[in-house]
């Protein structure tokens, strides 16, 4: 099954739409992202054609950006967060999915960053980039992020299940 093609080329440069199962969905600009606490991460990706490539990125944690949009978790149930997926879309249509548990400090604690600087250079309207430290190759590196969608896994479990 081929993935659906998503045309994100019309999205405004330097703007990220936060959508899905959020209490406060919104569009956030690069300037807004700069006001959040920053994190520096160094990554090394094994590229098929050019070998290992190393970069340093700086920007807010994806977790902090999404917490500000108030994901629709059940606050009384600590593990409820583990049902949520985070899908990230780049301007070129490239997509990557992370689990909330992967980036949550109580579980996987992966410091995924929305990078605003790469190797000391401001990405400006070519940012942010999703950067996932620890990934062996750069498949989940998403350039020019235009949308981040948080979704509970309910639809996945409802699909193709026998009706009772």
What does each of the following model-derived ranges do?
Residues 1-164:
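N-terminal intrinsically disordered, low-complexity segments enriched in P/E/S/T
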């Amino acid at each position: 099954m081929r993935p659906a093609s998503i045309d994100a080329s019309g999205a405004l440069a330097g703007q990220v739409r936060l959508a899905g199962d959020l209490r406060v969905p919104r569009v956030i600009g690069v300037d807004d992202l700069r006001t959040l606490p920053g994190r520096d991460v160094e990554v090394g990706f094994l590229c098929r054609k050019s070998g290992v490539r190393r970069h340093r990125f700086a920007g807010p944690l994806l977790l902090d950006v999404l917490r500000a949009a108030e994901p629709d978790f059940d606050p009384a149930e600590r593990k409820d967060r583990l049902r949520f997926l985070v899908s990230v879309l780049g301007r070129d249509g490239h997509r990557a999915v992370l689990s909330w548990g992967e980036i949550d400090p109580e579980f996987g604690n992966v410091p995924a960053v929305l990078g605003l600087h790469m190797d000391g250079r401001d990405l400006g309207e070519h940012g942010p980039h999703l950067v996932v430290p620890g990934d062996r190759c750069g498949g989940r590196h998403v350039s020019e992020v235009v949308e981040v969608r948080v979704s509970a896994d309910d639809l996945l479990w409802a699909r193709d299940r026998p009706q009772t």
